[in-house]
Structure formats: structure tokens, C-alpha cells
């Protein structure tokens, strides 16, 4: 009897990839045979780090784990899922606001392609953590190492610091 691999996408801009994201990956991994961390090129969100830097930083976190791959995409999530043979989308939820947004997205994704969304709730101590908060703290020169997944921290700090330095000189 042949079984189908359970492939899931964990999607986001991951700018930067935080310990909250890392927690979702750790908890999603046992549920699936393969987890693709799908890094979005979003025209609707302003990102600090280039897509190649975000992908490389996340790849460094999961180097050597054959169950995890990291890929960039710039189209609809359901189109990425179809290309990769993924039948599931994993999303993290921190709040009621996140839940409402994710429920709406899940409904549309299911209507478009039949893909199912699996929601994992943030651990309580991580429910206030967001990439936006980390970027803001970085902008003001604060140490964010406690919230950024290792080894992405050093690469992100260098990229953000260089970017902020260039903006201040203009």
C-alpha cells in the first residue's frame, strides 16, 4: 500500500525569522513528512531584508534537517502549494485578530484549491512577539538576540544595521 507524503507549507515573510516562527516549525514538524518554509516576496509588505538573505538565514537554522526545505515564492500561496505537492498550510496564531485573519485566508485557500490550513497557537510566552516588533527594536539599536532564531540573528543584525546606516546618510 502506497502512502502519500504529508507535505505542508509554513508561509510568511519571516523578516526576520523569530523564535516564535521557530516554535511553530518545531511543533508542526512531527505532523508532516516534509515541511517547506515558504518565504513570501510580498508586494504589500515593506521588508527590511532581501528575499535571498531571508531564505539563507532560515536555511542556516535548519541545515542538515532533511524534513525541512526553504523556498521563496512570489505568487499565491495555493499556487506554491500546488507546485510543491503540499496539501496543508501551517500558520501560527497569536491572538483573536490573527485567528480571524487566518480563518478568512483558510476559507479562500480551501475554495481555490482544496488545501487545508492547520493553525498552531503561539506559546503563551511568545504571543506578543512579532517580526515587526523585532525590526522596530533593531532600528533603534536594541539587542534582539533573545527573539531572533539562531543563527539568523547575526546576519539579520548586519543587514538591518547596514540598511539603517545607509538611510541615515541620505
Task: Specify the residue positions occupied by each region the protein language model found.
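Nucleotidyltransferase catalytic core that binds NTPs
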Residues: 1-170
Amino acid at each position: 500500500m502506497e502512502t502519500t507524503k504529508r507535505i505542508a507549507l509554513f508561509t510568511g515573510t519571516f523578516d526576520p525569522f523569530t523564535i516564535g516562527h521557530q516554535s511553530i516549525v518545531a511543533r508542526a514538524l512531527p505532523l508532516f513528512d516534509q515541511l517547506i518554509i515558504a518565504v513570501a516576496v510580498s508586494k504589500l509588505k515593506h521588508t527590511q531584508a532581501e528575499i535571498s538573505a531571508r531564505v539563507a538565514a532560515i536555511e542556516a537554522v535548519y541545515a542538515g534537517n532533511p524534513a525541512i526545505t526553504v523556498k521563496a515564492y512570489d505568487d499565491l500561496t495555493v499556487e506554491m502549494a500546488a507546485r510543491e505537492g503540499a496539501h496543508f498550510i501551517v500558520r501560527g496564531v497569536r491572538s483573536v485578530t490573527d485567528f480571524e485573519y487566518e480563518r478568512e485566508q483558510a476559507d479562500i485557500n480551501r475554495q481555490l484549491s482544496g488545501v487545508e490550513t492547520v493553525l498552531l497557537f503561539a506559546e503563551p510566552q511568545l504571543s506578543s512577539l512579532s517580526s515587526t516588533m523585532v525590526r522596530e527594536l533593531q532600528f533603534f539599536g536594541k539587542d534582539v538576540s533573545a527573539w531572533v532564531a539562531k543563527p539568523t540573528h547575526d546576519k539579520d543584525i548586519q543587514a538591518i544595521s547596514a540598511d539603517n546606516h545607509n538611510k541615515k546618510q541620505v
